[in-house]
Swiss-Prot record:
Impact upon substituting C116S: In OA1; results in altered glycosylation pattern and subcellular localization consistent with protein retention in the endoplasmic reticulum
Name used for this protein in its record: G-protein coupled receptor 143
Naturally occurring in which organism (per UniProt): Homo sapiens (Human)
Organism phylogeny: Eukaryota, Metazoa, Chordata, Craniata, Vertebrata
Listed result of changing A173D: In OA1; results in altered glycosylation pattern and subcellular localization consistent with protein retention in the endoplasmic reticulum
Assembly and binders: Interacts with heterotrimeric G(i) proteins. Interacts with ARRB1 and ARRB2. Interacts with MLANA.
Transmembrane spans: 29-49, 79-99, 125-145, 150-170, 192-212, 249-269, 293-313
Stretches assigned to the Cytoplasmic side: 50-78, 146-149, 213-248, 314-404
Region (Disordered): 338-404
Extracellular side: 1-28, 100-124, 171-191, 270-292
Outcome of mutating I261N: In OA1; results in altered glycosylation pattern and subcellular localization consistent with protein retention in the endoplasmic reticulum
Polar residues: bias regions: 355-366
Short motif (lysosomal/melanosomal membrane localization signal): ranges: 222-231, 329-330
UniProt-reported outcome of changing G118E: In OA1; results in altered glycosylation pattern and subcellular localization consistent with protein retention in the endoplasmic reticulum
Length: 404
């Protein structure tokens, strides 16, 4: 489970709200986290085993677009963060005496404290970076549709994702563990920077990504209508695929992380009470404990559920997956080429304008393919479809494709 509370566990002088969830069935909780994390890693490996659509021998060897690199970075962060959860839960279950020394009020041993702080910061840093990468994906999707940019900004995405995540994580840890791990300062003013590290990018993804996705869907509709001046059934289907995909992404994020926001709100509310053990606060304590266990189940599941949202099931053939609905990229490109035939009433001697139009059309196809499929295969399909159109270059009515 990815929560800033993992870092406060390392402080012997932890607050009462943190102690409430820490002391509630700790072995059952870590066993649940271990099982959920192990299941996520196993399903993730099944997703990677066979390739769904291997590229043909004649496929162009092009570098992956920026969105694919962003998704790979987000997946790597999630995978490593989940691995950190599994290792931490394994140590908590297998070496209870090693962990108990962290809670010693008189003295804190160096190695248990180092493992506690290191594993907590590892999990928090990687999941924070994962959220920043998901925000970069939404930004890149919008920029690609608006101005066909992406690869040129991948370095900026790396700086923003890793730089902001590292900066916030280091600052939060320095404030939380001041002056030392064994004598952490109590109070919200020291803990708030630590919580900002995790919840700032999470809230940014939950609030800003839907806005960017909606703007992207609107821009996609305008792009599809502007290519031929009409909105065909095939193009309407393409726009619907992109819209549904964005909806699935946000649904997974809300399902996996809403419990964290609810739990943290309840614990902050308890911290502001003079006595959290009061009878009137029993429903709040019960809700906090319940959402704490829900977090242990849903947080590690994010990576696998996002892979389903992006690509569907791509792993071992289990015999029950439904056939995928492919978009007719070839017919789209062909129809665009047919729309480029000059009218008998129009002059024929302007190949440059036809070439620019066709290049722009191919770029928009690649952008749409990148959003609807999110893999290299979709871009390859478009190149294949474009090559099939290039075979008709002998026809003077067909404009030639330019190199991108």
């Amino acid at each position: 489970m990815a929560s800033p509370r993992l870092g406060t566990f390392c402080c012997p002088t932890r607050d009462a709200a943190t102690q409430l969830v820490l002391s509630f069935q700790p072995r059952a909780f870590h066993a649940l986290c271990l099982g959920s994390g192990g299941l996520r890693l196993a399903l993730g490996l099944l997703q990677l085993l066979p390739g769904r659509r291997p590229a043909g021998p004649g496929s162009p060897a092009t570098s992956p677009p920026a969105s694919v690199r962003i998704l790979r970075a987000a997946a790597a962060c999630d995978l490593l963060g989940c691995l950190g959860m599994v290792i931490r839960s394994t140590v908590w279950l297998g070496f209870p005496n090693f962990v108990d020394s962290v809670s010693d009020m008189n003295h804190t041993e160096i190695w248990p404290a180092a493992f506690c702080v290191g594993s907590a910061m590892w999990i928090q840093l990687l999941y924070s970076a994962c959220f920043w990468w998901l925000f970069c994906y939404a930004v890149d999707a919008y920029l690609v549709i608006r101005r066909s940019a992406g690869l040129s900004t991948i370095l900026l995405y790396h700086i923003m994702a890793w730089g902001l995540a590292t900066l916030l994580c280091v600052e939060g840890a320095a404030m939380l563990y001041y002056p030392s791990v064994s004598r952490c300062e109590r109070g919200l003013d020291h803990a708030i920077p630590h919580y900002v590290t995790m919840y700032l990018p999470l809230l940014l993804v939950l609030v800003a990504n839907p806005i960017l996705f909606q703007k992207t869907v609107t821009a996609v509709a305008s792009l599809l209508k502007g290519r031929q001046g009409i909105y065909t059934e095939n193009e309407r289907r393409m726009g619907a695929v992109i819209k549904i995909r964005f909806f699935k992404i946000m649904l997974v994020l809300i399902i996996c992380w809403l419990s964290n926001i609810i739990n943290e709100s309840l614990l902050f509310y308890l911290e502001m009470q003079t006595d959290i053990n009061g009878g009137s606060l029993k429903p709040v304590r019960t809700a906090a404990k319940t959402t704490w266990f829900i977090m242990g189940i849903l947080n590690p599941a994010q990576g696998f559920l996002l892979s389903l949202a992006f690509y569907g099931w791509t792993g071992c053939s289990l015999g029950f997956q439904s056939p995928r609905k492919e978009i007719q990229w070839e017919s789209l490109t062909t129809s665009a080429a047919e729309g480029a035939h000059p009218s008998p009433l129009m002059p024929h001697e302007n190949p440059a304008s036809g070439k620019v139009s066709q290049v722009g059309g191919q770029t928009s196809d690649e952008a749409l393919s990148m959003l609807s499929e999110g893999s290299d295969a979709s871009t390859i399909e478009i190149h294949t479809a474009s090559e099939s159109c290039n075979k008709n270059e002998g026809d003077p009515a067909l404009p030639t494709h330019g190199d991108l």
